[in-house]
Amino acid sequence: MDKLSLKNKDWKYFYLSDFFDFEKGNQNNMASLSTGTLPLVSAKKTDNGYKGFVSKEQKKVFRGEILTLNNDGDGGAGIAYYQPTSMALDSHVSALIPKSNLNKYHLLFVSMCITKQRKRFGHGYSINSNRLRAFKIMLPLGADYANPDWQFMEEYMRRKETLLLKPAVEKLCKRLIHKEILGGG
């Protein structure tokens, strides 16, 4: 039996607001933004929501290690992304700021659980502050059957990361070795 199988866990609904504070992005005049080094996250369905890089001047800067949630957008409504670095958010995106110490792997797992529900949202039914407060996600239960199993979520996402990265790392190593043997390295 695979101890990291999602099917082998008991699950329970939790409110997003149990674990996150919410803050809506405030960049709404995209044409006036000057180019810089601060990532700008918009309601895109690709590229982790990154639209470009803007100047930090007079911008609300959100810290990294949070989730962003597309409120509406180009088919991306309901998609959640883990954001590792500081960023600016456009007005079609909400920041989900952890209330407690959630790490990268916890946030990746929760973003996956949120995104699984994205079909509920779209231009006719966007995410707003009331819907965010009422938003529930299913999470695996810990041994106490009351709280989420954060350790399981971390181990599950670490394994996923390893499985996804391993082929790319092996390919890169082969290229580097090949380049070293044939010269030019």
Residue ranges and their predicted role:
Residues 1-26, 34-48, 143-185:
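Non-catalytic DNA-recognition/assembly elements of restriction-modification systems
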Residues 53-56, 122-128, 163-174:
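Short, tandemly repeated low-complexity microdomains enriched for cysteine and small residues
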Residues 53-112:
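A short beta-sheet element
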Residues 87-93, 124-143:
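A short glycine-rich beta-alpha junction/loop motif
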Residues 31, 72, 104, 112, ...:
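A conserved ligand/cofactor-binding region detector
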Residues 25-29, 53-56:
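Short secondary-structure capping/turn segments at boundaries of alpha-helices and beta-strands
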Residues 99-102, 141-145:
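A generic structural motif
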Residues 9-16, 40-41, 68, 80-82, ...:
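General detector of folded, globular domains
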